[in-house]
Amino acid sequence: MSDILQKILAVKAEEVAAARKHRDLPSVRAEAEANRSDSTLRARGFARAMRDKIAAGNAAVIAEVKKASPSKGVLRPNFKPADIARSYAEHGAACLSVLTDEQFFQGHADYLREARAACTLPVLRKDFMVDLYQVYEARSWGADCILLIVAALDQGLMEELEACALELGMDVLVEVHDGHELDRALRLQTPLVGVNNRNLRTFETTLDTTLGLLKHMPDDRIVVTESGILTPDDVRKMRAAAVNAFLVGEAFMRADDPGAELARLFA
């Protein structure tokens, strides 16, 4: 595990402990379960939205709402989650990914709420999930999907977090970086397998990470290529290899109009 990931996970454990003191688990769980029957907050079907785009012959784009990153700093000083979400929805995104990590990515729970309220797209809570509390918390905020990072979790906890998410009606995007992590990810139920092209130790990106894992991917999984998609050529390279699902953040966040950049990149 990289030093930065270890540092982030230590902070996450502290955040969960502090959150439990502010609002206990039974309260968060009750709110999460109540949202299953709320017409505006019930889960929107993240995996289904991805499948529908691909079935129609289109790229399924998870468009990211991200103010900053540890490696690049602030990406978008004029950061308005609702406006960004509407722009993505108008230009063909399948789903949204909203950063909720505060310390490292300058995210916030309110950004997820604002983005989801501004459109009808399903929303991923993009964060480092290490505890069941965060899964219930995500659903209580309205999240339709959570991210599980294989490098950050042991197998038992990862399967427990997935089971909780599925029970609440959410989907799960499991993220891998190499073949060993992929073997572990394929033991989960989720069809959504994200391949992060960024090396967690060097922060360098190469699309060969995704391409190299394709031969090990079962046909019933949707491969989501993450990080390093910056040009139309990158998109064409992936689609030529039958990779039709993408998670893109930086390229959109640096553009004047994120949605228009989505349309240009995936034209």
From Swiss-Prot:
Enzyme Commission numbers on file: 4.1.1.48
UniProt GO MF annotations: indole-3-glycerol-phosphate synthase activity; phosphoribosylanthranilate isomerase activity
Pathway the protein acts in: Amino-acid biosynthesis; L-tryptophan biosynthesis; L-tryptophan from chorismate: step 4/5
InterPro entries: Aldolase_TIM, Indole-3-glycerol_P_synth, Indole-3-glycerol_P_synth_dom, Indole-3-GlycerolPSynthase_CS, RibuloseP-bd_barrel
Catalytic activity: 1-(2-carboxyphenylamino)-1-deoxy-D-ribulose 5-phosphate + H(+) = (1S,2R)-1-C-(indol-3-yl)glycerol 3-phosphate + CO2 + H2O
Alphabetized UniProt keyword annotations: Amino-acid biosynthesis, Aromatic amino acid biosynthesis, Decarboxylase, Lyase, Tryptophan biosynthesis
EC category name: lyase
Similarity annotation: Belongs to the TrpC family.
Name of this chain's protein: Indole-3-glycerol phosphate synthase
Organism the protein comes from: Ralstonia pickettii (strain 12J)
